[in-house]
Amino acid sequence: SGKTMVYFEALKDIINKGFQGLILLPEIGLTGQFEKKFIEFFGFTPAVWHSGITKKKKEIIWSGIANGEIKVVIGARSSLFLPFKKLGLIIVDEEHDQSYKQDEGVTYNARDMAIARASFENIPINLITPGPLKINSQSPSFTQVLFKDDLKPQ
């Protein structure tokens, strides 16, 4: 979609500057289709992080993120807590989705935690949603960009 291409361009810029990127998706089921779009655009495979991957794979990904070898992670809520060496951008796709809320064990909202991490690390965050949320549109730092189908700003 148009919104995906816009934030892919932002992510490409971050990667070209030597930083890592994190894309949060609300559901594990969205990962496969999203990963295909990513590979078509970037020409490489991102790391994928969620509860369904094996312990061995998690260890490999954890190490690759910590040493900076892995440039992009597509993940569920828990990917926020990965040890990025040089995180440069967080993207929360479908930020309005209730799946970002963790209600069992330690309760938190991954969207809010992403905002906090971006603030703590002094990096940009892109909150992607079909329309502005009231909480965002009232923020003094909120900028709304609307796109038509041809991707030209309105």
Model-derived regions, located:
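Motif I (Walker A/P-loop) of helicase-class P-loop NTPases
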Residues: 3-12, 114
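Conserved motor-coupling elements within RecA-like helicase/translocase cores
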Residues: 36-73, 84-85
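Residues immediately C-terminal
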Residues: 30, 79-81, 96-101
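Conserved SF1/SF2 helicase motif Ia
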Residues: 10-34
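Hydrophobic residues in beta-strands of the RecA-like P-loop NTPase core, especially within AAA+ ATPase
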Residues: 75, 92-93
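Loop/turn-to-beta-strand initiation segments
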Residues: 19-21, 45, 68-72, 86-89, ...
